[in-house]
Amino acid sequence: MSEQPVYGAAAEAPKPRVKVRTHHLHKWKAEGHKWAMLTAYDYSTAAVFDEAEIPVLLVGDSAANVVYGYDTTVPVTLDELIPLVRGVVRGAPHALVVADLPFGSYEAGPQQALATATRMLKETGAHAVKLEGGERVADQIAAVSAAGIPVMAHIGFTPQSVNGLGGFRVQGRGDAAEQTIHDAIAVQEAGAFAVVMEMVPAELATQITGKLTIPTVGIGAGPSCDAQVLVWQDMAGMTNGKTAKFVKRFGAVGDELRRAASDYAREVATGAFPADEHSY
């Protein structure tokens, strides 16, 4: 006869975490399970987000703004993004890591897109790429997907096209809604495994999410999308000044970092640091 534990049932061993793959995202959509995506740009931050069990990390071309200090995402290059992606991949062993293809690296056609995506995966270890546009980049998505590289699409407001769109404006209002729907269907048919919808009216995003079999990832697209994404500095309160309407701050990391830096500088100036316990 087997022995029974004296004080209650034995605790079950925790299940090992599973590496997130694209098929998990499709399964979650079918089950109605919503998930979160965050940007990440370095090893240390990626490790924190992986510990927080964020399933998908995006090394976005938003690095142009929050890492390199550009006003838009247009100037950032492939060579500038690749080292960032490497760090994120190393820091997040469980997350699906998606790497943005920067402006100018895929628009010329399918062959350019495939060459850029191939280089990105070979040199970084990323698991998927993201590119902006709907029907106009369907051929690029098809070529990259056919080569076995998962593609996340991006429709609605596309930051790389900010100059052509006349600034940061909501997309898909009025007559433009039909084109946004066409874009969503086009990227799905081209082989995208998911699609980001940015600054799209919530009602339209709900309609598109219901039409597609692939997950929709909202950023300023209302609550009905299958997932949500934010730039981590916006989410955690790292950035100063005015943020977009769709941003909610879940922390005050910037304030805490400033406090820590000020305390450190003060203790160095007064001789309080390093103390005996910090010395050999």
Swiss-Prot record:
GO BP terms in the entry: pantothenate biosynthetic process
Residues reported to bind 3-methyl-2-oxobutanoate: 61-62, 100, 130
Cofactor: Mg(2+)
PANTHER family xref list: 3-METHYL-2-OXOBUTANOATE HYDROXYMETHYLTRANSFERASE
EC number: 2.1.2.11
Family: Belongs to the PanB family.
UniProt KW keywords: Cytoplasm, Magnesium, Metal-binding, Pantothenate biosynthesis, Transferase
Major place of residence: cytoplasm
Pathway membership, UniProt: Cofactor biosynthesis; (R)-pantothenate biosynthesis; (R)-pantoate from 3-methyl-2-oxobutanoate: step 1/2
Gene3D superfamilies linked: Phosphoenolpyruvate-binding domains
Localization, UniProt: Cytoplasm
Organism (species): Mycolicibacterium vanbaalenii (strain DSM 7251 / JCM 13017 / BCRC 16820 / KCTC 9966 / NRRL B-24157 / PYR-1)
Cofactor detail note: Binds 1 Mg(2+) ion per subunit.
GO molecular function: 3-methyl-2-oxobutanoate hydroxymethyltransferase activity; magnesium ion binding
Leading EC class: transferase
Residues at the active site: 198
SUPFAM superfamilies named in the record: Phosphoenolpyruvate/pyruvate domain (SSF51621)
Protein name (record): 3-methyl-2-oxobutanoate hydroxymethyltransferase
Catalytic activities: 3-methyl-2-oxobutanoate + (6R)-5,10-methylene-5,6,7,8-tetrahydrofolate + H2O = 2-dehydropantoate + (6S)-5,6,7,8-tetrahydrofolate
